[in-house]
Amino acid sequence: MMKHPYRIIMRTVLCATVAWSMCSCDDGHVDDPVFENTEDSYNVEITGKFQSLNTWRGTYSVAAACFNDESNYSLIQKVLPSSTEDTVQVLKLSNVPTNAKTVEIAVTNTLRKRIATLYSYPIPYNQRYSDTIKIDVGTLNVGMFGSINQFIFQGTGTNCARCHSAERPTANLDLTAAHAYNSLVNAPAEKDPSKLRVKPGDAEGSFLYKVISEGDENVGYSHVGLFTDDTYAPFLDIIKAWIDGGAKE
Ligand code: HEC
């Protein structure tokens, strides 16, 4: 007597399912194709609006750059093109070495050494080499004052805004992000009213520069030590160049 064909099909399906599930449970050796290396470099595409780029003076530049953990010198970088403020820029970095750990918008010196990070994107550990890394940074203030404000006045290493804020108005000075510019530029110094804190065009005559570069007898806390560290030392120059260049916002 012939078996019902439906039964045969069902039995086949059942056997196949059991065999497949046993096999896949036991098998720990299957390579995940997502992590397969297909190339030996990344391509990166950064989109964003970069404001106040043209306020930079001196030998520093703002660049899209890639870094690894070991060095402050970029593996590869492209200086942002000086262009009109309200145009969205698309920057491309190709042949980025696969040991790159971050894609950054950073202030760099002429030797491609990182002076300050303004934006950082950590490359995911499972990033596929064959795919372009696409990053949208939105609108970023990359100007000279914007960089000083972000890296020094709000920085966690210098802590200016921790001692100088509306809540803790030491020397009646508010260095929080939204107030730093107006608290400094053309504002008379509390501890030496004969001077402005920042006198545009004249760093040597500005109280801010005196306090951070050599100190002042009327200021009961030495700020010079905040800028001796390698990380912050370049900002003595940058702040001087910013003031001498007209202290633009
Ligand atoms: C640990 C607290 C502390 C930190 C951090 C700090 N300051 Fe001060 N700052 C002071 C004190 C205290 C004074 C002097 C107040 C006094 O003598 O009455 C002062 C005074 C000043 C003055 C003089 C203001 C005036 O009008 O007389 C400036 C400028 C200044 N600080 C800038 C900075 C900057 C820039 C930073 C960060 C790089 C900073 N401070 C970090 C405590 C601090």
Predicted regions and their residues:
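Aromatic- and Gly/Pro-enriched helix-to-coil junctions and flexible linker segments
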Residues: 25-44, 48-76, 82-89, 96-249
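Sec-dependent bacterial lipoprotein signal peptides
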Residues: 1-24
